[in-house]
């Protein structure tokens, strides 16, 4: 009886060790890719991973000349059908346009005319800054002060008073910066700064 219980105990221990051995062997198995060896199990593997950085840099430099030029982004101007879009240099950026910027925090102009992503330009004079430079400066430096923020309120001059010009044309002496969270101004308040 002792021998049968001893044999049974040995079989149970052998079975338990074989189950535990399988789970540890599954953990120690090398993954299919050699890229994961140093990160997943550095103690079980003595292999050194050597990244072929010279080959990557060389491939990047040799392929660089064959890559197309980048024509993407927010505010992309247009695609002209008369020329290949790959021959133009980088034409991307936030709000990149030939006319004044009409976006952002505190934008002064009320008319927002977004450009589409892909269209041909019929009137190139409209996008030229040379012929309407005065209009551009008037729009850019108009009499409207900086007024931005959440809950901003406009300001009015008291009855009978006129806006006094500052150093430059269209500079208004008055509350130029009206910003803040929920900042409200009553109509009867005189705004003197």
Swiss-Prot record:
Function, in words: May act as a neurotransmitter or neuromodulator.
Secretion signal span: 1-25
Compartments (UniProt record): Secreted
Tissue specificity note: Allatostatins A1, A2 and A3 are expressed in brain, antennal lobes, optical lobes, gnathal ganglia, the retrocerebral complex and thoracic, abdominal and ventral ganglia. Allatostain A4 is expressed in brain (at protein level).
The protein, known as: Allatostatin A
Residues with Isoleucine amide modification: 74, 94, 105, 150
One Gene Ontology cellular component: extracellular region
Similarity section: Belongs to the allatostatin family.
Keywords: Amidation, Cleavage on pair of basic residues, Neuropeptide, Secreted, Signal
Organism from which the protein derives: Camponotus floridanus
Residue(s) carrying Serine amide: 165
Proregion residues excised on maturation: 26-64, 78-84, 109-139, 169-193
């Amino acid at each position: 009886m002792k021998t049968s219980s001893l044999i049974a105990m040995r079989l149970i221990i052998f079975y338990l060790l074989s189950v535990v051995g399988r789970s540890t062997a599954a953990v120690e198995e090398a993954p299919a890719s050699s890229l994961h060896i140093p990160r997943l199990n550095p103690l079980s593997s003595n292999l050194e991973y050597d990244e072929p950085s010279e080959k990557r840099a060389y491939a990047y430099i040799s392929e660089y000349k064959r890559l197309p030029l980048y024509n993407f982004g927010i505010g992309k101007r247009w695609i002209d059908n008369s020329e290949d879009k790959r021959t133009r240099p980088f034409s991307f950026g936030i709000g990149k346009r030939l006319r004044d910027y009409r976006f952002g925090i505190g934008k002064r102009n009320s008319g927002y005319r977004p450009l589409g992503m892909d269209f041909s330009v019929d009137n190139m004079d409209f996008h030229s800054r040379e012929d309407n430079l005065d209009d551009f400066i008037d729009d850019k430096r108009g009499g409207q002060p900086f007024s931005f923020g959440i809950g901003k309120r406009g300001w009015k001059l008291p009855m009978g008073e006129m806006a006094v010009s500052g150093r430059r044309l269209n500079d208004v002496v008055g509350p130029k910066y009206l910003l803040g969270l929920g900042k409200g101004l009553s109509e009867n308040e005189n705004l003197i700064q």
